[in-house]
Amino acid sequence: MPLLDTPFAQLDLIRQPEQQNEPLQAFDAADEYLLNHLAEQNLPIETRVLVLNDSFGALAISLSGNVQVSTSGDSFLAFQGLEKNLLRNGQAFDALRGIPASEPLVGPFDRVLIRVPKTLALLEEQLIRLQGQLAPGAQVVAAAMVKHLPRAAGDLLERYIGPVQASLAVKKARLLIATPEAKAPAVSPYPTRYRLDEPAIELLNHANVFCREGLDIGTRAFLPHLPKNLGAAGVADLGCGNGVLAIASALQNPDAHYTLVDESFMAVQSAAENWRAALGEREAIVRAGDGLAGQEAQSLDVVLCNPPFHQQQVVGDFLAWRMFQQAREALVVGGALYIVGNRHLGYHSKLARLFRGVEQVAATPKFVILKARK
């Protein structure tokens, strides 16, 4: 893999989760453009720089030791990549601490560097949280590859920060440079809420939660077919989002024990709040993580999963395949993984490579619900 070579540092970076024969590198031309733009300013070492949505540490590690860096984002995997890449490049793994997007920012900041996320609601929430956190003379610079840069990103910067100047494109990347101006305090539209009839619950959704405006159609197809009569089983909601699968299952299985895990900190925050609202003081483990990577082997009886098919702008079934492998490792012999997936993704054949038996529980014209027994 090529090195990230900028005026600040030369870095050897890896993506997360790691894959054999990884076809993608851990940085892109937008990272290079941002770093070169900052280098041209010859900023003193005491400059306070906030990095938002750094994929795997490309920006924060490059700047470490050159300015005072804080880094925040909504991805557990990105922070895992930050730690591993710090070590890989001769720095202490805790030289930089990733601040989850669910936690407040503490400024003031002289420069803010933003990688524009796939979910613009996350960008909007982050810009709102910058209110009162920018030092006099601050600059906010957002970057993306041109093909992933919607006009709405510039509109959000202008609404919440100030006038925006778009750079020329360099290596198919572009910068949006915002000059802060006095603004009336903005009220965040997040979290959003919606109600379900069956089960009768209200679900809260922070900005980066998948389908935060309403239940996605895959989950809607899955809910009537969740397993019942689980007794005191150990159940995991893998990639839990706002926690709806675990909550619906728990309402039907009062003695079961639940673990909810997602790599999005905002999803985990939403799931924890929704669990408390629906189930009160009933205990559950709700955590951010790399799926079931930290789960003890053969410690679960049931895994529920609506697997994702993208990581930011990267589309593919590699995350789903990894989740299936993790579920197999975590399940007891005889335990079962229940999933919902688009018909065209062919999950049945993939699961058959890992599990003793795979059966179709239900189907709609678009989705299948599958049960895979270890």
Curated annotation (Swiss-Prot):
An example Gene Ontology molecular-function term: nucleic acid binding
The EC number(s) this enzyme carries: 2.1.1.174
GO CC list: cytoplasm
Major place of residence: cytoplasm
Reaction(s) this enzyme catalyzes, per UniProt: guanosine(1835) in 23S rRNA + S-adenosyl-L-methionine = N(2)-methylguanosine(1835) in 23S rRNA + S-adenosyl-L-homocysteine + H(+)
Keywords from the UniProt entry: Cytoplasm, Methyltransferase, rRNA processing, S-adenosyl-L-methionine, Transferase
Keyword Iron attributed: no
Subcellular location: Cytoplasm
CDD domains in UniProt: AdoMet_MTases
PANTHER family given in the database record: RIBOSOMAL RNA LARGE SUBUNIT METHYLTRANSFERASE G (PTHR47816:SF5), RIBOSOMAL RNA SMALL SUBUNIT METHYLTRANSFERASE C (PTHR47816)
Family: Belongs to the methyltransferase superfamily. RlmG family.
Function: Specifically methylates the guanine in position 1835 (m2G1835) of 23S rRNA.
Protein name per the record: Ribosomal RNA large subunit methyltransferase G
Gene: rlmG
